[in-house]
């Protein structure tokens, strides 16, 4: 599958949010990752539908709204109306995951499920045929700039095996600590959607940072092949 970069605005300069998001896309980002945190499910507060709506005016690529919130079903319609293309929900935050994934799909969005570092991939067995993507958290959610958790590679590889064995087509996405030192291992393990925040934003030139990370990922793809 094609390797894609999903720049995460969590690490961007919010005073220049639209401009920096566009720069990351010009550098090769093909999905914009929007981290939504409620201060309850994770210990941080970020953005909501108004920011998504504003970004929609200037961003043409798909937006993946990663809902790190309690009771996501209550807010899914608002994010759809604001302009979300993909909506990713945590298995750990959803009592009836099957219902939630169907709700997302019923609104015409691509449904994704997210698992925290301590959650086994086997807990997703019954919903893998319902999702467009599975997002493996390779840090504990809540803050950007954390170090990559090495065991995440085993989870990515396990998902790749499950996908092949069941002849499914969901994408494998990874979020947390993805940078020039970790991206090759992540890709070789089987991930193809790469969320990157602090590796792209907050230092140097955003376009260059995105381009270099994507090039490193695609080089690793050739090595895997």
Positions of PLM-derived features:
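Active-site/ligand-binding-proximal alpha/beta "capping" segment
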Residues: 139-140, 147-193, 199
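Conserved beta-strand segments that form the floor/walls of ligand-binding pockets within enzyme
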Residues: 4, 114, 135-138, 173, ...
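A short, acidic/glycine-rich surface segment
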Residues: 119-123
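Short, acidic/turn-prone active-site loops that include or flank metal/cofactor-
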Residues: 92-94, 116-118, 139-143, 198-201
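Amphipathic, soluble alpha/beta structural segments
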Residues: 105-108, 113-115, 192, 197
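Conserved N-terminal beta1-alpha1 strand-loop-helix module at the mouth
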Residues: 1-88, 92-96, 103-106, 111, ...
């Amino acid at each position: 599958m094609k390797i894609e970069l999903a720049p995460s605005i969590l690490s961007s300069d919010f005073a220049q949010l639209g401009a920096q998001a566009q720069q990351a896309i010009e550098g090769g980002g093909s999905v914009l990752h929007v981290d939504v945190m409620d201060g309850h499910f994770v210990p941080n507060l970020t953005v909501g539908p108004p920011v998504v709506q504003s970004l929609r005016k200037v961003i043409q690529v798909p937006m993946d709204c990663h809902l790190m919130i309690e009771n996501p079903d209550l807010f899914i319609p608002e994010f759809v109306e604001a302009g979300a293309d993909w909506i990713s929900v945590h298995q750990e935050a959803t009592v009836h995951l099957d219902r939630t994934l169907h709700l997302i799909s019923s609104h015409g969005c691509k449904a994704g499920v997210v698992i925290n570092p301590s959650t086994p991939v086997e807990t997703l067995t019954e919903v893998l045929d319902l999702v467009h993507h599975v997002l493996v958290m390779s840090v504990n959610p809540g803050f950007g700039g954390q170090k990559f958790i090495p065991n995440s590679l085993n989870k990515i590889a396990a998902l790749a095996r499950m996908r092949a064995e069941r002849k499914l087509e969901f994408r494998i996405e990874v979020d947390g600590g993805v940078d020039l030192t970790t991206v090759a291992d992540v890709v070789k393990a089987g991930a193809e959607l790469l969320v990157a925040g602090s590796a792209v934003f907050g230092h140097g030139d955003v376009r260059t940072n995105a381009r270099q990370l994507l090039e490193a990922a695609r080089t690793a793809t050739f090595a895997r092949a």
